UniProtKB/Swiss-Prot annotation:
InterPro entries to which the protein is assigned, alphabetical: ATP_synth_F1_ATPase_gsu, ATP_synth_F1_gsu, ATP_synth_F1_gsu_CS
GO cellular component: plasma membrane-derived thylakoid membrane; proton-transporting ATP synthase complex
Lineage, uppermost ranks: Bacteria, Bacillati, Cyanobacteriota, Cyanophyceae, Nostocales
NCBIfam families linked: ATPsyn_F1gamma, PRK05621.1-2
Any matching Pfam family: ATP-synt
Gene: atpG
Organism for this UniProt entry: Nostoc punctiforme (strain ATCC 29133 / PCC 73102)
Protein name, per record: ATP synthase gamma chain
Reported function: Produces ATP from ADP in the presence of a proton gradient across the membrane. The gamma chain is believed to be important in regulating ATPase activity and the flow of protons through the CF(0) complex.
């Protein structure tokens, strides 16, 4: 009977755990939808900003503007902006981006260059602090759905590093969102800005949907809505001054998109991890229930044999 009670308690414990993992999966799904809505909400601003930059690019040659954020110089030190999460229970999301950042740092060191980290997320901060890596700034406790204010704060720190010439190049390492079951850590150069990278480009929107009772992600290519500025438009200020003012805003917008992609990747990884945990819990419950029924049947059979044996002894 003691064995039966232990199995019964274990079944109840696993059922309680399954309720928790299922709730976490649904919460992550709701937040993925919120992230999706935020991406759509920020598109008009991004399109208008791209329109102005595109128009300025058509009126002057960026190479002749000689702006600090476009100026390439000899690279002696590299800043690495790494975006990770604050929490675990999201599969290999944090480990993958941290490993990519660590490998990139080794590559930079092998080239004879210095590097320092700007870390977003508690997981990457804890990892690199324990290994005494050079860290310029850390950010944690950000909103589950990234905000423009957070992107601006990080962008200000990066601009300070670059313009003070503490670093000569800044690279961004984040997780690109591909699907609910797939994401990929990527590395891209943030500063100095590439004039060719300011051109209007098509975008991609993701939507969380349900099909057959399961969550799925639909991706849609969206043509850029950017149109050239009117040829007779007159700028009150010098176009170079306008461009100099808009480039930091463009950088913040790029950071916001990277934060959004990383957040969506983390939430999708958590959804997948919790879904797998729920399925494993269900299988474990079935196995334990089968074991419980077998043990109970064996106990009943043993009691019957004892009763029959006792009755035969009395006759």
């Amino acid at each position: 009977m003691a064995n039966l009670k232990a199995i019964r308690d274990r079944i109840q414990s696993v059922k309680n755990t399954k309720k928790i993992t299922e709730a976490m999966r649904l919460v992550a799904a709701a937040r993925v939808r919120r992230a999706q809505e935020q991406v759509l909400a920020t598109r008009p601003f991004a399109d208008r900003l791209a329109q102005v930059l595109y128009g300025l690019q058509s009126r002057l040659r960026f190479e002749e503007a000689n702006l600090p954020l476009l100026r390439k110089r000899e690279v002696k030190s590299v800043g690495l902006l790494v975006i990770s999460g604050d929490r675990g229970l999201c599969g290999g999301y944090n480990n993958n981006v941290i490993r990519r950042a660590e490998n990139r740092a080794k590559e930079i060191k092998a080239e004879g260059l210095n590097y320092q980290f700007v870390l977003v997320g508690r997981k990457s901060t804890q990892y690199f602090q324990r290994r005494d890596q050079p860290i310029d700034a850390t950010y944690s406790g950000l909103e589950q759905i990234p905000t423009a204010a957070e992107a601006n704060q990080i962008a200000d720190q990066l601009l300070s590093l670059f313009l003070s010439e503490e670093v000569d190049r800044i690279e961004l390492i984040y997780t690109r969102f591909l699907s609910l079951v797939s994401s990929r850590p990527v590395v891209q150069t943030l500063l100095p800005l590439d004039p060719q990278g300011l051109e209007a480009a098509d975008d991609e929107i993701f939507r969380l949907t349900t099909r057959g009772g399961k969550f799925e992600v639909e991706r849609e290519k969206v043509a850029s809505q950017v149109r050239p500025l009117a040829p007779d438009m007159i700028f009150e200020q010098d176009p170079v001054q306008i461009l100099d003012s808009l480039l930091p805003l463009y950088l913040s917008n790029q950071l916001l998109r990277a934060l959004q992609e990383s957040a969506a990747s983390e939430l999708a990884a958590r959804m997948t991890a919790m879904s797998n945990a729920s399925e494993n819990a269900g299988e474990l419950i079935n196995t334990l229930t089968l074991s419980y029924n077998k043990a109970r049947q064996a106990a009943i059979t043993q009691e019957l044999l004892e009763v029959v044996g006792g009755a035969e002894a009395l006759t």
